Design a protein with these regions (language model features):
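Helix-hairpin-helix
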Residues: 1-17
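Conserved RecA-like ASCE P-loop NTPase motor core of nucleic-acid helicases/translocases
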Residues: 17, 272-279, 432-438
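Structural detector for short beta-strands of small beta-barrel domains
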Residues: 31-56, 94
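Upstream accessory/linker segments immediately N-terminal to the RecA-like ATPase cores of bacterial MutS
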Residues: 56, 62-218
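ASCE P-loop NTPase motor cores of helicases and related translocases
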Residues: 177-329
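Conserved motor-coupling elements within RecA-like helicase/translocase cores
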Residues: 305-322, 329-336, 471-487
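Post-DEXD/H (motif II) to motif III coupling segment of the RecA-like Helicase ATP-binding lobe
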Residues: 335-340, 346-426
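C-terminal helicase module of SF1/SF2 nucleic-acid helicases/translocases
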Residues: 415-431, 449-627
């Protein structure tokens, strides 16, 4: 069968077909013992009819057991008596009922083929056609040629070519056993990883970059963590390659990714580097860090929406590193000398924005700049594994210093306790942030808005600052608060990247309305420099299991795993469905070991088989490289 014909059934590949398991089975095996619930076939002789109130009862005789049996039909059609003619001998298939020694079958079918287990598919196609399709294509040889291990292939074959023992176990468990479920999960994961790997396209690098970053690292007033050094080495290898780098660098809040960004600039030097950040506050903060730590010989420039600099002129001059916001996307830039393009907090940008940033530095279609994306929003290992098929992934899984943050769930009765804590922190010259869910009052919210709560805090504490995403002066407010403030009233705008070194406490109102990743980013604003930190979750639902799990874990990677359990994974292939399940059998939060095995198997493969043999996965049933 050709790939086109397979596509008529809605499948693009043999492995995809192999995960389309039957929803159930019917047995035409001859029943070998008469007991309640026995399913299968009996050879019977028709003796008489009895009809009443839209019910037809046919008295018959089970020949193999020499026992009477009643065949019952509700709302019988006229053809029933033709199928079960008096004195005829037929094979009937159904489920046996034993009512106190009186045997019966409800709505039995007449069959011509006996001693078979018939798969039943949920499909708009004819069941017979699906059986023909699966039984002709799904064989041990074909599945192993697709790369599946023999144990997985064997279990999958049994799904579509069931025997009596398989059917017995299926009926007893009312579903597939663990070995069969494992095979379905493995096949689905393997197929998905394979599809992702073919989505990746590599290009030649504009420049091979071999700048001496090690000397710069050794000159720093502190030592990079082992994780930072490992990731720097991975990036250095990328940038020295003839192939354009395409790498995502992930780490927890406070993992020190800024130093990895600056090290990457040193690797690219003397060629130029470009960095885009999601907000001007974060971009300016990165600019200040670059000025502080990079050699004074480097010319570093910050570009904001208000900047009047001529970028063409800048790049024609000796500028080495440009840092900016999305304003970079709307400026004329000569990208000839740009070797490295980076985006910080990459998830804050759309795919089109990141692509356009890359295009700024691309001179021709045959080569591309090195691309690095940075994120302080960890994702689970299984999702990182999926990402890694399209883009290289590095993980900074170590913090420069351990974070000491106590997370407490509170509700209204404990508000005085919270107030006392805030007073103590303010008196100790430490800062507090209070995060509101809304700026203005809303009838739909049971919580106070920022505007409603503002007067309460201003009458009790000095140096109270207030801002939100709607505030045009928010960046100025944040800067003033960082220098002089005691309490900051804000929305989630402080979620990403903002440095508030004196912030010891964050109070998040209505945390149940926020995603766990956002909660973790907000909590990560405190204890930035080893300061003892406190996070209070003020909620009307203190018994929330989701919030309790969040409060019990500090690691962003643990939080990502918990979030995955509640939210499920999005579709990495097409960028759709960032929430909601897309897997039929596998579970990203529970099947990590299966992901590891499938990924290792796929990584070990040097090539994908290609053949004109229709049994081959590279052949007519749908080549893997066609995904």
């Amino acid at each position: 069968m050709s790939a086109q014909e397979l596509g008529k059934f809605g499948f693009s590949h043999l492995l995809e077909l192999a995960t389309f398991a039957p929803s159930g089975y019917e047995s035409t095996m001859l029943i070998d013992s008469l007991h309640n619930g026995a399913q299968g076939a009996l050879e019977v002789q028709i003796l008489s009819y009895k009809g009443y109130a839209k019910v037809l009862q046919i008295s018959a005789y089970a020949l193999a057991f020499s026992q009477p049996i009643t065949l019952t039909f509700f709302h019988p059609k006229p053809y029933i008596k033709r199928l079960f003619a008096l004195d005829s001998v037929v094979f009937v298939q159904g489920v046996l009922r034993d009512d106190g020694g009186r045997l019966s079958m409800i709505q039995p079918k007449t069959i011509r083929e006996i001693n078979a287990i018939i798969p039943k598919f949920k499909t708009t196609h004819k069941n017979a056609d699906m059986i023909s399709l699966t039984q002709s294509l799904i064989t041990q040889e074909a599945l192993q040629e697709c790369g599946l291990p023999s144990d997985v292939a064997d279990s999958l074959v049994r799904i579509f070519h069931p025997d009596k023992e398989f059917f017995r176990i299926f009926c007893a468990r009312k579903g597939f056993d663990e070995k069969t479920l494992y095979a379905l999960k493995f096949c689905e994961i393997y197929c998905h990883l394979l599809r992702l790997s073919t989505k990746r396209t590599d290009y030649a690098a504009k420049y091979r970059c071999t700048g001496d970053y090690q000397s710069w690292v050794e000159s720093l007033p502190f030592t990079l963590t082992n994780a930072q050094q490992r990731v720097c080495a991975q990036i250095a290898s990328d940038l020295a390659s003839h192939k354009a780098a395409k790498r995502l660098v992930m780490g927890d809040v406070g993992c020190g990714k800024t130093m990895v960004i600056l090290a990457s600039v040193m690797m690219a030097y003397p060629k130029k580097s470009l960095l885009m950040a999601p907000t001007s506050v974060l971009a300016k903060q990165l600019y200040e860090q670059a000025l502080l730590y990079l050699p004074k010989s480097l010319n570093i420039t910050y570009i904001s929406a208000e900047s009047k600099q001529d970028l063409q002129g800048l790049f024609a001059s000796q500028v080495d590193f440009i840092i900016g916001t999305q304003a970079l996307l709307y400026r004329e830039i000569s990208g000839e000398e740009i070797a490295l393009v980076m985006s910080d907090e990459q998830h804050r940008f759309g795919v089109k924005q990141r692509h356009y940033l890359e295009k700024l530095a691309q001179v021709d279609s045959s080569s591309k700049p090195h691309i690095l994306q940075f994120s302080a929003t960890p994702i689970p290992r299984t999702m990182a594994m999926l990402e890694s098929k399209m883009i290289d992934v590095s993980i900074i899984d170590e913090l420069p210093y351990p974070k000491d943050i106590t997370t407490t769930i509170i509700s209204k009765p404990r508000f005085p306790e919270l107030l006392a804590h805030i007073s103590a922190e303010v008196q100790a010259a430490r800062q507090v942030a209070i995060i509101y869910p809304l700026v203005e009052e809303s009838q739909a919210s049971e919580y106070l808005s920022l505007k409603e709560g503002e007067s309460f805090w201003r009458t009790r504490f000095p140096q109270v600052y207030s801002t939100s995403g709607q505030d045009k002066e928010k960046e100025k407010v944040l800067e003033e608060f960082a220098q002089n403030g005691s309490i900051l009233l804000a929305t989630t705008l402080i979620e990403v990247g903002i440095s508030l070194p004196k912030l010891s406490t964050i109070v998040i109102i209505a945390p149940e309305k926020l995603g766990l990743a956002t909660l973790h980013q907000l909590r990560g604003r405190v204890s930035r420099n080893g300061l003892k930190g406190y996070c209070y979750l003020y909620t009307h639902t203190p018994d929330s299991a989701r919030l309790r799990e969040f409060a019990a874990h500090l690691s962003g990677f643990d939080i990502a795993q918990i979030d995955l359990k509640y939210r499920k994974g999005g579709d990495l292939l097409d960028g759709k469905r960032q929430s909601g399940a897309q897997w039929i059998w596998a579970d990203l939060s529970e099947d990590e070991a299966i992901f590891d095995r499938a990924n290792a198997l796929l990584t070990d493969k040097k090539s994908i088989p290609k053949s004109n043999d229709s049994r081959d996965c590279g052949g007519a049933v749908g080549a893997l490289h066609d995904f």
